[in-house]
Structure formats: structure tokens, C-alpha cells
Amino acid sequence: MDFITINSSNKTEEFALKQVAKQATSSLLYRLGKTIILASVCVEREPVSEDFLPLVVQFLEKSYAAGKIPGGFVKREGRAQDFEILTSRLIDRTLRPLFPKDYRYPTQITLMVLSHDIENDLQVSALNAASAALFLAHIAPIKSVSACRIARMDNEFIINPSASLLNQSSLDLFVSGTKESLNMIEMRSLGQKLNALEEPLMLEALELAQKSLEETCTLYEEIFTPHQNELFFKESQGIVFNERLLDLLKNQYFDEIIKGIESSALSERENVFNEIARKISEAHSEFSLEEIELSLEKVKKTEIRRMIIKDKIRPDKRALEEVRPILIESDLLPMAHSSILFTRGQTQSLVVGVLGTDNDAQTHESLEHKAPIKERFMFHYNFPPFCVGEASSIGAASRRELGHGNLAKRALETSIKNKEQVIRLVSEILESNGSSSMASVCAGSLALYASGVEIYDLVAGVAMGMVSEGQDHAILSDISGLEDAEGDMDFKIAGNLEGITAMQMDTKMSGIKLEILYQALLQAKEARKHILKIMHEAKEKIVINFSHLPTTEIFNVAPDKIVEIIGQGGRVIKEIVEKFEVKIDLNKPSGEVKIMGNKERVLKTKEFILNYLHSLDQELEQYAIDEVLEAQVKRIVDFGAFLSLPKGGEGLLRKQNMDKCQVVLKEGDSIRCRVISFNKGKIALDLA
């Protein structure tokens, strides 16, 4: 068993090697303060035949890690929570580009949170633990990576802030990479205001992150290298292509290949290339279908990259900085509170907005918070198979759908002025040819406005790409699905004219240099300006139907009157809600009553509640202290009996008053009683 301590970037990390889970390919216990994570890597010895990297990353939270028992009926951890899925994706997106292109061995990386102090950053800790475990496993020649988080307070950047400091920050920037370059970025603005970050400041933050990663990765490699396993997989020389087949494709089928490249729809493009492969297979039996498809893919990819880098033209004939045509339509769905159809090229997002009450907020339990938290702004992204012409069933939300919805939410969240408002936006992707998450951001921002939600500014999103060959590279604005698939970078950036509110960067390379990222940021700003101009023009044409939108009426009553509004077993409040078709939130300590729904119904509900309480007060005013009454037993409870009074209303005869007279009552009995007090709107009775 080996213990390793590493001090870097404002934190002290401890690694216990060969202590637990020793049957895994590699395992370690990672410790940062009171946070402990078990990281393990397991590799199967037989490769898969399919052409993909069979990597699975699972980040798992255990309730006992924070001294909790799972909430709900089943007291056991169930399906993964959103935070676990998003963190798993974050780690996967960091590590996947590091593997050799022809690595085909099923690999599972598991991160299990065993203990957690809420002040420590779980995502940074989990990624660093995964990186160390993978580096020690030595399953392939993989570089060491690490992560850091950057916050901003009082115009100063902070590396790896505590949770309490991050809550006060205007920036949340998560960066991972090697000591040479960055390979994954997640960013969002924080705070009560929009807090969009300007591009030069973003570069400054990324430079700070790169220095932190360089320091940590250098230490990791120096300290962990002596503890590595024997190298399992040595990168091969790659696929050896048949030159005769490549010449055949270039000379006889080149025009058809270009036709396929220029096809805008994925299904249409696949049909063209499948037809080419079929023709060659029938005419040249000496080539296998697999060999033909691999060679066809190589020629296609080479030509796409040549077009972009050398000719400065894209497969759909756009210039490198050109954004596809945009069409925006509003108010398509009469019963929703807002609906926006945003079409950019062959990508189409229908975002629907609905406003709700506090009861509609999503409640989450997690290790990052001591108590359950309410998510008041929800953004759900759906990617049905028909949007790319596929025939398959629609199931539960995928990891990708959760990730895209989370990105759109982070882009728009700070643009909302009233953070207490409960809002749900749903993006239905009806057509997709790249950048669907950024189309969701654009449509979502307009949907907020169309719902009558007060926003600081419109927010637009654009996906940037890059193609590189040697020392040459080209940055692409508003990438299509083909450019995403064949390119080297997917850099999604959202913001307004002032700066950036959210971004996400992934790469297929081992990393991206800062100067390329900054060029992409500046080019994205120009694309955003163009998109925002069209969005502002569309905004001017939106007519907000305030009569259809739900309104909220808030008023106060005496706190002791809240129980009267609720009624026995919730009977009164249920009747009010059903009668007026509204939503009601009640606050017992303050006496606040919040009614939400159609404006006319809300006002009628308020009037009804006030009249109802007034009638109860009038009933009390009919009685006097020491007045003797003939009452009837209405119901028996543990602490006494409720009696129906002759002039209306009811009073409580407590059990101790019945016991001292040795009286046994049953429902329906008549009894003489005396009014002894009025307490919080209730009449207290004694036997006369």
C-alpha cells in the first residue's frame, strides 16, 4: 500500500494506492479534506469488433457519504440523479480524446463518493481521481490530465474556490486538460444579474486555468509514473489502406462523393455513400464491404478537410464565418404560455414555456447541499429520432439530452430577473443538422420574453468548430452535423452583445491551444451579433397575451387563519382549488397566501377566501364569554370533541374538561356547554 500527497493549485490531495478494490486493473482512494472517492479502472482483455471506443464512466454518489438516508419510499440509492449523469459526462468528455484511435478494449471507470464535505468540489475531485486511476492503469499511452475550477469575486479570479466562495462568485468556469493544452471546458455566469463575461477576461481566466493544469499534471506524471502498471496496449500504426481502392474512389466515384458531402440531410448523405459502396462491391468483388466503407470514409474526410482549410469553403458552400439562414415564428401553440419555433438551416427547435408556482418547482437531494433544494428554472431538451430521419422508439431522456438541457439552462438562468419565479422551458428538436442545443438557447430566450418573464437581455448561442491539418487550421461558425462529425472541436458559446453567459468545449484531439480558443471566442461574438439582431427583430413582433398568462396575487392574513383556509384534512383548500382552477401556496408562519392562475379566477379566489374568513369572524362575534349554549357533538378526536354551535360555527371541548366531569360523549349527542375563551379564531368550551 502506497500513500501519496500532492500539493497544487490551492489544494492538498491524498492518494492511497493498492489499499482497496485490488482486483480492478487499477484503483485508488482519493482524499481532499473530508471528501473521499474510490476510483477504479477495469479493462476486458478481448477487444470489440465495432469501430468505436467502448469506454463507460460512472460517477456514483452514496447518501451515507454525507450522513444521510435516501429520501422517498425506497431507502436505497436508485437510478442516477442528474448531477451524477452530468458529472459522468464531464469526466468521459475529458478522458475520451486521450485514448488511441484504434483502442477497442471495453473499459469501465467508476467513481464512488464514500465521504463528502460540502465545501470541497466533487467534480474537480472526481476527475482528478479518475485521471490518476487511468494513468496508473497504463492501459494505453495516455497523458495525465487534471481539472480546476475558476471563480470571480470583486474582479479577481480564484482557483479552486470552496463551495461557499463559489456561491458568491459571478463566474463558474470548469476546465480540464493536459499540461500542454485544454480539452474540455464548462462555463456559466452566476449571480442575481446577467454577469456576462467579456472575451478578453475569459481568455485571462483560461490562461490561469492552463497554468494550474500544467502545475498539477506535471506533478501527477512525476509522482505516479513509478507506480504505473505494465503497458497493456501499444498504439498500432493504424489502418493500412488499399491504394488501388483509394485511386478507384478518387478517379471514378469522386463526383458522387462530392454529391454526398454536399447533401444537407444525414439520411440523404448516408444513402449516397451506401449506394457508392454497393456499386463498388458489385463491380469489384476483390474488395470487402468493410474495406470499401473504410476507404470511402477516408476519402470523404480528406476532401472535407481540404475544402475547408485550402479552399476556405464548407460542404454546404458557406464561408467559414457564415451563419445559416434563420427563421423565427412565435405563438404557435394557443394553450401554452409561450411557444417559439427557431429554425437555423436544417436545425429546428420548438421551445415551449410554462409558468408555475412553488409547488411546481423540482426538488433535488444531493451531497452538495445539506437540505433538499428547489429548482425553479427548468429547461428540458428532447431529441426524438425523427429529427434526423431515424425510425426508432422514444424512451427516457438520454445522457446527451440531459447535458444539452443543462447547457441551455445555464446559458439563460442569469438572464431572468426574478429568480423566485417557477418556469419550465421544453425544447423539442424537430429537425437536426448540428447546433441544436444552441438553437434551443435562442428559442428559449425568446420564449422567456413571450411568457411575460422579465429578462435582462436576450441570449443567443452558436456552435463553433475547427478543422486542423498540421500547422494549418480553420475556425467554423455555426457548424453543421457533418462538420461536427468530421471536425476536431465542438465549442458551444452563448451570451449577449456584452459577453458570454455559458459555454462548453469538447475536442477529438488531445487538446486545444489557447490562441485557437480565443480566435473562436472572437469569431463567435460576431456570429452572436448577427443572430441577436434577427432575434431582436423577432422580439418586436411578439405580442404577449397577458390575459392568457397566469398571474400571481399575494396577500397576507393572520397566521392563525391559514388553518381555516386549509380546513379539516385539507378539505377547504381542495374545494377552493377545484372550484376556481387555480394553484395556491400557503405560508403558515407568515400568513402569506399566494394564488396563481388565470387573472379573473385569481381575483375571484382572493375574494372568496377573504369573504370566507370574514364569515368565520362574524360567527365568532355572535358569542360571548360565559355564554351557555346547547351544542351537538360533531366529531370525537384524541384531544377532545368538536361541537356544532347553535348560531353557526364550532367549538372545542378539550378532553381534560370532559374527564373532570367523567362525561363520555359520542357523535350526535346534545350537551350544555359554556364559552370560556376565544383563542386564534377558535372557541374554547367547557361543560356547563
Swiss-Prot record:
Residues 550-609 form the KH domain. GO terms for molecular function: 3'-5'-RNA exonuclease activity; magnesium ion binding; polyribonucleotide nucleotidyltransferase activity; RNA binding. Its cofactor is Mg(2+). Keywords: Cytoplasm, Magnesium, Metal-binding, Nucleotidyltransferase, RNA-binding, Transferase. InterPro entries: ExoRNase_PH_dom1 (IPR001247), ExoRNase_PH_dom2 (IPR015847), ExoRNase_PH_dom2_sf (IPR036345), KH_dom (IPR004087), KH_dom_type_1 (IPR004088), KH_dom_type_1_sf (IPR036612), NA-bd_OB-fold (IPR012340), PNPase (IPR012162). The keyword Nucleotidyltransferase applies. GO terms for biological process: mRNA catabolic process; RNA catabolic process; RNA processing. One of its GO terms (cellular component) is cytosol. Gene3D superfamilies: GHMP Kinase, N-terminal domain, K Homology domain, type 1, Nucleic acid-binding proteins. PROSITE patterns: KH_TYPE_1 (PS50084), S1 (PS50126). It is found in: Cytoplasm. Residues 626-688 form the S1 motif domain. The keyword Kinase does not apply. Mg(2+) binds at residues 484, 490. It catalyses: RNA(n+1) + phosphate = RNA(n) + a ribonucleoside 5'-diphosphate. Involved in mRNA degradation. Catalyzes the phosphorolysis of single-stranded polyribonucleotides processively in the 3'- to 5'-direction. Belongs to the polyribonucleotide nucleotidyltransferase family. This is Polyribonucleotide nucleotidyltransferase. It comes from Helicobacter pylori (strain ATCC 700392 / 26695) (Campylobacter pylori).
